[in-house]
Amino acid sequence: MMSTLFPKLSIKKEDTLPALAISELNDWALITMIGNDKKSYLQGQVTADVVTLPQDDITFGGHCDAKGKLWSIFQLFNHNDGYALFQRRSAIETELTEIKKYSVFSKVDIAVGDDVLLGISGKKATDWVNKHTTTDANVRACELGTFAKISETQWLLVTTPEHKKNIINQESNTVLCDESLWSLHTIQHGLPQLDNALSNAHIPQAMNLQAVGGISFAKGCYTGQETVARAKYRGINKRAMYLLSGQSNSIPVAGDAIERSVGENWRKGGTIVSAYRFEDGYTLALAILPNDLEEGTQFKLQDSIWNKGNQPYSLDEE
């Protein structure tokens, strides 16, 4: 059922995006982690370097199985007296089970948070956050809750139902819309995310986690590290996440298969990670594809031809 407070925003390809918009992020959730052993426990589980993460900063990270396949992709930051791992809700149940698997041996409490998650997006998002905070850090605790910078045009606010109500009442001149606009910003910035349809299927480098600072190759051991390291030093990874564009009749969803041209034929070429469809049918998507594609390779989805674009970052590892 569509929210009347946060309605879908009708946008065409040529339209200018709202300079400031607020969305409730119902398709996202937090896993929270508190307790004396939270830092050491998480350090041994994920690709990011938790030990060196500053109190007021945020980092991408991934949680893998022993073979290096991802259970989750998250953005990690300090929240209240512990950690928050911001990730897709569809994969949260599986991830909670996996991340808690060895917690019985540590003083750590892991749960799915019940906070309200608001997404502040647009070129004026940082200006809006600045009005409510007193620092210029990437993570800011304030009266409203915790702000975390997701990208140059996206801020997450972890807050309460009461603060959400007050914000809606006070922001009469701000665009309130559903979270599809948030998804568009995420895709434009090339940010990886992992829904349940992609769970336990890909290694971190196949989803560009190294390109967004989500893998530390200097930290100690963690689950799946051997595979992740071999992908870097021995070149065993054969996939990466790319931006695609084309026409669609309906919005593609995570896990949808894409075909690619091979000579005069078509064969399975990749998998959708996330997508946004404009009102005129023009669609942007992030997709996992082979990383050795020939120049000019075309793609097909929903019987339409799609083309590969450029990501806003380099995929080359140092």
Curated annotation (Swiss-Prot):
SUPFAM superfamilies: Aminomethyltransferase beta-barrel domain, Folate-binding domain. Keywords: Cytoplasm, Folate-binding, tRNA processing. It is found in: Cytoplasm. Gene3D superfamilies: 2.40.30.160, 3.30.70.1630, Aminomethyltransferase beta-barrel domains (3.30.70.1400). GO terms for molecular function: folic acid binding. Folate binds at residues 28, 182. Its main location: cytoplasm. GO terms for cellular component: cytoplasm. The keyword Transmembrane does not apply. GO terms for biological process: iron-sulfur cluster assembly; RNA modification; tRNA processing. InterPro entries: GcvT/YgfZ_C, tRNA-modifying_YgfZ, YgfZ/GcvT, YgfZ/GcvT_CS, YgfZ_barrel. Folate-binding protein involved in regulating the level of ATP-DnaA and in the modification of some tRNAs. It is probably a key factor in regulatory networks that act via tRNA modification, such as initiation of chromosomal replication. Belongs to the tRNA-modifying YgfZ family. This is tRNA-modifying protein YgfZ. It comes from Aliivibrio salmonicida (strain LFI1238) (Vibrio salmonicida (strain LFI1238)).
